[in-house]
Amino acid sequence: MSALPVVVTLLLCGQLLAVEISSEATADSCPKAPEIANSHVEYSVRYQCDKYYKLRAGDGVYTFNNKQWINKDIGQQLPECEDASCPEPPKIENGYVEHSIRFQCKTYYKLRSAGDGVYTFNSKKQWINKNVGQQLPECEAVCGKPKHPVDQVQRIIGGSLDAKGSFPWQAKMVSHHNLISGATLINERWLLTTAKNLYLGHTSDKKAKDIAPTLRLYVGKNQPVEVEKVVLHPDRSKVDIGLIKLRQKVPVNEKVMPICLPSKDYVAVGRVGYVSGWGRNANFNFTEHLKYIMLPVADQDKCVEHYENSTVPENKTDKSPVGVQPILNKNTFCVGLSKYQEDTCYGDAGSAFVVHDQEDDTWYAAGILSFDKSCAVAEYGVYVKVTSILDWVRKTIADN
């Protein structure tokens, strides 16, 4: 007798599970039964469920007859094992029972869809959610919820600040000439940085597709991630911004978490935000540890006047910047020095100016540092306003 493969379908508390069972019955494995007068021999098998399961119907005994396995109760229908730990609920008058499950996301993730994650198994053997129907839920990364917010971190001597995990969205980018700059994680696979950062060590005619392979990128505690592509803003002469797409999603955890993109403007004059980075320190050396600084949003008109005067020799002051000038327009805002006269510096560009919204206890990226040449010499740092590029960011991510 040849081997008979059997497939048993399990119903686990209302959830169908297909389970393959390798069941064999062979004549060689059983000695031939002795013959008696006026009779015939039938071969039979008994299906038994695993521990904590029970047969749904029939006694599990199948007899081989005319090359078919037959059960006296359910015929050729194969048996099903059901979860014995889920007893049938009691019946109620004018009522019925529905089996339901709830999808839940892992720590640091949340449901993306409009539904509540509860699905009911209906008579058509479909899992249905009251809000989204048969559409399965998706889990997306939580953003702007650091485990150790910045206000819980102690300031250290010397004016520099130790982040200690307060800025899990901060990434470090290294060019092919080993020039360090910043980038900001905005979801599991995309980061914002400046167009100037992407062109570090490259000529202005370099194509974006040729820049991507030259970049080294690190998130969390120097965890390397691979760059798939870069996308530059179509008007990068006026909007110093670019997007980086990773080959794989980064797992979100305590050390790696995206910053939230704002739905409103957080750059009113006097508003305080924080900037982190690996830029040069007071000795003009790149720091080995992530530092941060608290800075106030400055008056835009005064900032523009400051930089315009710096190009006129007779108007220059000790605080006038030298060399390249920042991009200043409706897409930017300015930030002043800290109360300790501290500032961002070379290598900090691409980092986010983040603000804490106390209403929803969430951190948002209000700006991306574009002009990091001030280094406490000029009075103002210049940032790309994130609300001004939101449409482009969302479209770029959707199209890629």
Curated annotation (Swiss-Prot):
Residues forming coiled coils: none
Residue numbers spanned by region Interaction with CD163: 312-317
Example GO molecular function: hemoglobin binding
Annotated InterPro entries: Peptidase_S1_PA, Peptidase_S1_PA_chymotrypsin, Peptidase_S1A, Sushi/SCR/CCP_sf, Sushi_SCR_CCP_dom, Trypsin_dom
Chief location category: secreted
UniProt keyword Mitochondrion present: no
Signal peptide: 1-18
The protein's assembly and partners: Tetramer of two alpha and two beta chains; disulfide-linked. The hemoglobin/haptoglobin complex is composed of a haptoglobin dimer bound to two hemoglobin alpha-beta dimers. Interacts with CD163. Interacts with ERGIC3.
Function field: As a result of hemolysis, hemoglobin is found to accumulate in the kidney and is secreted in the urine. Haptoglobin captures, and combines with free plasma hemoglobin to allow hepatic recycling of heme iron and to prevent kidney damage. Haptoglobin also acts as an antioxidant, has antibacterial activity and plays a role in modulating many aspects of the acute phase response. Hemoglobin/haptoglobin complexes are rapidly cleared by the macrophage CD163 scavenger receptor expressed on the surface of liver Kupfer cells through an endocytic lysosomal degradation pathway.
Family affiliation: Belongs to the peptidase S1 family.
Protein name (Swiss-Prot/TrEMBL): Haptoglobin
The species this protein was found in: Cervus elaphus (Red deer)
Organismal lineage: Eukaryota, Metazoa, Chordata, Craniata, Vertebrata
